[in-house]
Regions:
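Short alpha-helix plus adjacent loop in nuclease-associated cores
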Residues: 1-4
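Gly/Ser/Thr-rich active-site cleft segment
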Residues: 8-119
Length: 119
């Protein structure tokens, strides 16, 4: 991933940090390289935080911009997925990711209704 975009300095300038193996972007790259068939069958890739929100709201929850930058996949100048970092990570990655959204912009709905229907 790092070599594909021009080195650690480029990754750091784009995402705010160098690509460290434990970060999500490098882990996605590792998953793709180790098992391309399983990666191809993967429909959605979330962080735990956005996945839990998705379960609670019953829809795809966005990934916070700060979390996305910590994945080494969000550009800190545009606060959106960085196409060069995505392409260096795995093919068609953008299609597997939810949208990016600044923190503090919550969703007001949830999938779990605590009150049963009253008829």
């Amino acid at each position: 991933m790092t070599a594909a975009v021009g080195g650690e300095e480029v990754v750091c300038a784009k995402s705010g940090s160098i690509a460290i193996e434990r970060f999500t972007g490098p882990q996605i790259r590792r998953f793709y390289k180790n098992d391309p068939a399983a990666y191809e069958q993967t429909a959605r890739i979330h962080l735990v935080s956005s996945f839990l929100c998705s379960v609670l709201i019953g829809a795809d929850a966005p990934i916070d911009t700060g979390d996305g930058a910590g994945m080494n996949l969000v550009n800190i100048d545009t606060w959106d997925w960085d196409s060069e970092l995505l392409d260096a990570t795995a093919p068609d990655l953008l299609a597997k990711l939810p949208p990016v959204q600044p923190g503090g912009r919550g969703r007001a709905t949830h999938a779990l209704d605590p009150t049963p229907d009253r008829k």
